[in-house]
Amino acid sequence: MAGTKPGDLGGVKVGQYVVIEGVACKVMDTAHSKPGKHGGAKVRLVAVGIFEPVKKEHVGPASSRIDIPLIDKRKGQVLALMGDNVQIMDMETYETLEIPMPDDVEGIESGVEVEYFEAMDRYKITRVISK
């Protein structure tokens, strides 16, 4: 699964995922403001990149559209640790993937089951399921 779908900027909530400047991000803060009698409501989003820890901001009319990344959460088994990468076998399709080793996930070793997700043709390990 890859790509994005359009969504309403005014309906985005904290914890949801959006695409800002081509980067898939998790929304950390939203602010709605109505500037005046004749202006439309504005929405300000503060988000952090999923794959790189970059902070992104987006301001736009509440009625405008924003891209929502299609995220596919899956389970896999760690086959091997290869330096800065982890080789994972998907538990449903049995395909093997090389995913960068995450800094924030503890307990990754050969044979454990992990949860990972794919968004915009990139992969990230989110947590260890079983040891």
UniProtKB/Swiss-Prot annotation:
This is Translation initiation factor 5A. GO terms for biological process: positive regulation of translational elongation; positive regulation of translational termination. One of its GO terms (molecular function) is translation elongation factor activity. InterPro entries: IF5A-like, IF5A-like_N, NA-bd_OB-fold, Rib_uL2_dom2, Trans_elong_IF5A_hypusine_site, Transl_elong_IF5A_arc, Transl_elong_IF5A_C, Translation_prot_SH3-like_sf. It comes from the Archaea. Keywords: Cytoplasm, Hypusine, Initiation factor, Protein biosynthesis. The gene is eIF5A. Belongs to the eIF-5A family. Its main location: cytoplasm. PROSITE patterns: IF5A_HYPUSINE. Functions by promoting the formation of the first peptide bond. It comes from Methanococcus maripaludis (strain C7 / ATCC BAA-1331). One of its GO terms (cellular component) is cytoplasm. It is found in: Cytoplasm. The keyword Acyltransferase does not apply. The modification Hypusine is found at K37.
